[in-house]
Amino acid sequence: MFRRERSIPLRSSAAALSNNLSVLQLPARDLTHFGVVHGPSAQLLSAAPEGVPLAQRQLHVKEGAGVSPPLITQVHWCVLPFRVLLVLTSHRGIQMYESDGSVMVYWHALDSGDASSVQAMFARGIAASVHFICVGTCSGRVLVFDIPAKGPNIVLSEELAGHQTPITDIATERAQGQDGVADMVTADDSGVLCVWRSGPEFTLLTRIPGFGVPCPSVQLWQGIVAAGYGNGQVRLYDASTGALHVQISAHARTISALDLAPEVGKLLSAAEDTFVHIWKLNRNPESGSIEVEHCHGECISDTQVCGARFCDPLGSSFAVTGYDLAEILRFGTV
């Protein structure tokens, strides 16, 4: 069971964007960082375990020649083996900062080739894999950046082509050196999923076709792809074969966020229907089939939920953001 805990106030409410919450836990300092997008700015907050806000910072998109400031599409902390970077995507490009947002270490501008003349340019979908950071674009390409152990010498090393429509989300999992193991999945506006193996050159392993609805959020855990769709469904696929194992009518409206607690296999789903659900994933050791169990449901009354994340790898607490809601809601186990 979960209960509501002290919420964290925001200067501005969260924008109505999917995956509009990023969480970075710092156990050594007993702190949790939260990142939320609102229009042309991203709010970064630090909070103590009991939810007491300790610091706030606002980040803005690198200015260009435009009349109005460009909108931010996502903010996300990328945890690499040797450093943590904060990545911000927008209608103008990709910005990478040190983890506290104090120093921008890299800027990548989107070029006109990233979109047609009638389509807005933007980047969206952020994830870290080994020493790479992968970012999706509106053209369906995934940009792979090679990240050094320190300093600003970040290099665009590869562009992955597997999608024809804008990228919505990217998820990764550490493959722990296993050859041939899928460790990244990308999703797009048409619902297509691409499963990849990272490395000096990324390899497309499986392409899972869509079925006419977008896939706003995706996760990867122990060879299981969890995908949340615009019709409220959560589908679980085998990453190696692309086979559909489980289909859940989880929500009544578009799913806005999925998250995983990797140490226990808990899956969190949140949607515009005001509900947040927690599920337990498992792979049957005898049959190899994927199994799922519903663990908890939480109604965020009168709120269009746009972001939700676990706050620890055991899934014992989670946080939620909502459109026009000027606070981050927190829940913890009783």
Swiss-Prot record:
GO terms for biological process: fusion of sperm to egg plasma membrane involved in single fertilization; negative regulation of receptor internalization; regulation of epidermal growth factor receptor signaling pathway; regulation of MAPK cascade; single fertilization. Keywords: Cell membrane, Cytoplasm, Fertilization, Membrane, Repeat, Ubl conjugation, WD repeat. Its main location: other. SMART domains: WD40. It holds the Pfam family WDR54. GO terms for molecular function: protein homodimerization activity. The keyword Cell inner membrane does not apply. One of its GO terms (cellular component) is cytoplasm. Transmembrane segments: none annotated. It is found in: Vesicle; Cytoplasm; Cell membrane. Homodimer and homotrimer; forms tight forms of dimers and trimers. Interacts with IZUMO1 and IZUMO1R/JUNO. This is WD repeat-containing protein 54. The gene is Wdr54.
